[in-house]
Amino acid sequence: AQDYLIRGQLQDALVHRILDYNIQLKQAREQIRHLSNRDTLTGVLNRVGFRAHLERAMDRSKRYGFNTALLYINIDQFTNINDNYGESDGDVMIKTISQRLVNKMRSTDSIARLGGDEFAIVLEDVNSTAGVELITEEMLKSISAPMLLSDQQVAVEASIGVAICPQDGGGFSDLVEHARSAMQQAKCIEAMKALNAPHSVMLLEIDAVNMYDTAAENMGKVFISTE
């Protein structure tokens, strides 16, 4: 009888260990899945996570009839900053900008780092172009706020291209290409230069302090795709 009792206790202990192992295995898999969708430097979505989020947002947009906006963001002159201050300070800048963007987002929005100095933000359920313009302007102001790198005050410029689903493309690749193209056009604009491009309907200017602490007018630029 005692042997039977011991065997029963051992079996119970084994069952508990198996259950604990399965729980830990499930948690480990969830952790791996989560990390596989995240940028290691900033903790925001990476390209893989970005694609999944944008495709889901576009599906909801088509199903429920609301607009989804894609903001494609490039940090201007980041290579020069990286060269002048070093990769460590470059990483600090990227993390700082990432956090600033996160702080300006709504709970329904998502952000991804696409690599290097490029970010993407998905804005769901946007009611109007004017609303997108307001959000984008706030993003530019936040990015251009001075930050300290190696005890020097540095401000950066950014260019943002905007595309809106469904009118600018119903597929992932089309929408991203429209937003990226609009960003590249914005990047070419100089201060006070008139706009005359297929995508452009708006330009936002942001005054900022340049990286050498002398007064200068730098520009954050936005194109909204209208194709």
Residue spans of the language-model regions?
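The C-terminal output helix
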Residues: 19-33, 186-190
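Short hydrophobic/aromatic beta-strand micro-patches
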Residues: 122-124, 163
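N-terminal membrane insertion elements
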Residues: 1-26
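Amphipathic HAMP/coiled-coil signal-transducing linker helices
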Residues: 28-45, 59
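Hydrophobic/aromatic docking surface of two-component receiver
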Residues: 8-10, 125-127, 167
